[in-house]
Amino acid sequence: MPDKPTKEKLMEQLKGGIIVSCQALPGEPLYSETGGIMPLMAKAAQEAGAVGIRANSVRDIKEIQAITDLPIIGIIKKDYPPQEPFITATMTEVDQLAALNIAVIAMDCTKRDRHDGLDIASFIRQVKEKYPNQLLMADISTFDEGLVAHQAGIDFVGTTLSGYTPYSRQEAGPDVALIEALCKAGIAVIAEGKIHSPEEAKKINDLGVAGIVVGGAITRPKEIAERFIEALKS
């Protein structure tokens, strides 16, 4: 297992490359109770030249770590109804991810009500205090959320949740305007969400982002097939 990179070192590794998100949740075609599928996705991504992996769950991350030294952005998806945030939503999930010695922990940093009752700035500060050497990524949906996370000391701001909160911009493709605004504000941006084509990735890379995550367009064959099938119907 490689040593954790510094922010500067990681930014060098990620610059101009693609981080591939390798995830499958229960009920999805590639989900397996016994595991073993996501590390194959990660292996394919590595062979293609990916610069990093985004993965969900302790099990999947451990399996991926066994086959690649690529930096991992780790999350744990767990529902806490009635609250909506479910991506690394409490310190419990942070603790589990921190024990894995991964490069980055990503967490929901939207303004929505949280299970722990904290505002997002307080949560970020608590995590930073507990794990001062752990790089953190804020999954946000609006510019203001990104700014709050940045000012609270987050290392990277990801546009992951744009279009997935009721108050954020609803678009079929990536939220380029949000990515551009965050970059112009001097924030280290990891662009993520609805990036469906190499052309979109190239356009986003030219904005000066710190990294780009692509998931569904690479690792969700059902979603990829649906896009082709829908195109023939139109």
From Swiss-Prot:
GO terms for molecular function: N-acylglucosamine-6-phosphate 2-epimerase activity. Gene3D superfamilies: Aldolase class I. It is an enzyme of class 5 (isomerase). It comes from the Bacteria. Pathway: Amino-sugar metabolism; N-acetylneuraminate degradation; D-fructose 6-phosphate from N-acetylneuraminate: step 3/5. It catalyses: an N-acyl-D-glucosamine 6-phosphate = an N-acyl-D-mannosamine 6-phosphate. GO terms for cellular component: cytosol. Pfam families: NanE. GO terms for biological process: carbohydrate metabolic process; N-acetylmannosamine catabolic process; N-acetylneuraminate catabolic process. Keywords: Carbohydrate metabolism, Isomerase. Its EC number is 5.1.3.9. InterPro entries: Aldolase_TIM (IPR013785), NanE (IPR007260), RibuloseP-bd_barrel (IPR011060). Signal peptide: none annotated. Belongs to the NanE family. PANTHER family: N-ACETYLMANNOSAMINE-6-PHOSPHATE 2-EPIMERASE-RELATED. Converts N-acetylmannosamine-6-phosphate (ManNAc-6-P) to N-acetylglucosamine-6-phosphate (GlcNAc-6-P). NCBIfam families: PRK01130.1 (NF002231). This is Putative N-acetylmannosamine-6-phosphate 2-epimerase. It comes from Streptococcus pyogenes serotype M1.
